[in-house]
Structures are given as structure tokens and as C-alpha cells.
Amino acid sequence: MTPSPEVVAILPSRDEADTIAAVTRAVDAALDDDRALIVHADSSSTPATAVAFRATATRARTVCLTGLPTGKGAQILRALDHHGQECVVLLADTDTRNPDPATYRALLNIVVQGAVMALADYPRYWDEANLTNHLARGLIALATGHDVPQPLAGDLALSAAAIRSVPERYHALPGQLARCVEGYGIDAFLLQAAARAEEPIVPVRLARTKQHAPSFPHLPVIFAQAVPVLLHPAVSGLAMAPEVGAFRLTDRELPARRLTRMLAQLRALRPAESRYDQTAWPHALAAAWRAVAGGVAAVTAAQWLWPAYLDHVSTWLADTSGMATRALTLRAAATELLLTLTTTPRDSS
């Protein structure tokens, strides 16, 4: 009889044939255990990614789940249903171009030592991570009371207790929100679930900037799926304001032609008609949170926020400030958001 694994690593993917083998080898080196299990959860458009995974030699046992529904969350949830209910779970992005066994090992060790969740905290290029830096970090802090520098990190570890809470929380979600969690909303959802435990959530500070496939081309889908999940906790009527730490940005040159192209893409994404009064950031974000607290569906509030977000990211990309100023600007905006929305429960006297 095959022994139950103490650790399951889940590798969600869609068309990552060029990087899946390196990520698999790095995860296997971190596990270093023939009782561990690596689950490839794949919804690729061709067999190439699964073929590359199966061809990668590992010490750990492997399972390849193919033909899964499209969506990162759907892949992860299906893998958890099959293999991840009673053990520590490692999640690893499969588009990573510089996978490091030490990172995965550090995440696992912290959870094994008693944390409910450990997340990679890597520096980000200043022109990337726009959803994290301008929106997700502040909203996660509001909802959970935890300042998590990279709340949407795809590289993380979760305790067995955290994993056991996932199915019930997922099935309790409204239909539209559940579909968001089946996509890019999964990262925020897992963090929100873990935050309900008493055990700590631990960011693992890393020195190297993460190298991965650019997310900018997928910005509309990522926003539409992640932001409703980030806003949904406002229905509780309670917001918390932990101290927000420094933002770590990595400098790099953004060629003028590329910047021009990105700004044009952002302009093209802006709805012709929208419910938008050009409220300054982060007050537009605060208004979206208040709307959800007042009964507006999180999906609707996210749609209202979209034009303001596009304008804010455009301004950020066009700005010529240095990294130190940019980092201070991000921290000030997140702090202002939290202080603006700090409240007491609705039923308090």
C-alpha cells in the first residue's frame, strides 16, 4: 500500500512547456522525499506541458491531472480534492524562469514549524505587480489584519488545517465569486482562509527578483477575477489597519516604445461609458470597499473600480520618479487606504 504523503506539491499550469521541467526539478529538490507527491494540475491547450512534466525524473512520486477546467483556481481546487486534504501543501507557479529549491524549502519549513501559511516575498520590478502594489496589499491588510508584501504570490505553503477549511469556504461563496476563485482569485481566497486561523502567516523574504511570464497582457482577466475576491470581505463591515511595511521595487529600464505601447493598451481597455467620477487613488479603492460594505456585489464594485485603476496604473507607468520615491508613494497610499477605512463592527455601540 502506498503511504500517505506528508507533503503534496501542486503545480498548476496552462501551456508552460518551456518552464515546467525546471520548476518540477526545483520542487523535487526542495521536497527531497520519496514519500512526497508532486501533482501537476494542467489545463493546457496542447499535451506539451504534460509531456514535459512526465519526462522529468523526480525522487517524489508524481501525478499528472490533465484536461482540467481552465483557471488557476480550478486547477488547484481539483488537485486539492484529489490529493491535498490531510497534509502540508506547497503551491508553485509553473511560469517561473528562475525556480529555486531553497525558496520552496523555506516555505515548507515555516509551515512545518507551525505557521498556517508561508508566502514568498520577493522584490518586484517597478512596472510589474501593479495589482499587488496598488490594490491587493492594502485590501488584504484591511480584510485580515496582516501586512503581506506579496499577497498574490503564487509560491506558498499551507498547513493541513488551512487546507481543510478550503472546501467549505469555497462552496459557501456566491456563484459569481466562486467563479472568480476558480480563476486568478484563488491566491487571495487562500490567504483569506488562512487568516482565520490563530497560527501565524509568515512572508519569507527573498533577495532575488522573481522572473516569470509577464502578467500585463492578462490584466483585464486578472483584475476581473482577483479584485472581487479582494473586495468581498467588506461585507463583514469590519476593516483593520495594520502598519504597512516598505515596498521593495527593482529598477529596470522601460524602453520608450514599450511604455508607449503599454499606455495605449491601457487607454484601449477603458470602457467608453463607465460609472467613474475620477476620484483620486486610493480614495477610489476606498469607495469600492464601502460600496461592497453597503450591499453592492463585489463583482459590480470591481467593475466600477476598473476605469480608476486603469488611469492610476497609466499615471504610475508614465511617472519618472526614482525607486525610493516610488516605494514611499506606494506605502503612503496603502497607509491612507487603511486609515480611511478603519472601522468598528456594524453592531458595536
What are these regions (language model features)?
Residues 224-349:
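Terminal low-complexity segments of carbohydrate-biosynthetic enzymes
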Residues 42-51, 96:
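A conserved acidic beta->alpha catalytic loop
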Residues 11, 34-45:
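Short beta-strand/loop segment that forms part of the nucleotide-sugar
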Residues 15-29:
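Short, well-formed alpha-helical segments that are part of the catalytic scaffolds
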Residues 99-121:
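Conserved donor-nucleotide/metal-binding helix-loop-beta segment in metal-dependent transferases, i.e.
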Residues 74-88:
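Active-site nucleotide-sugar/metal-binding loop of Leloir-type enzymes
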Residues 86-97:
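Short beta-strand-to-loop acidic/aromatic patch adjacent to the donor-nucleotide binding site
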Residues 36, 50-74:
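Conserved donor nucleotide-binding strand/loop of the catalytic core
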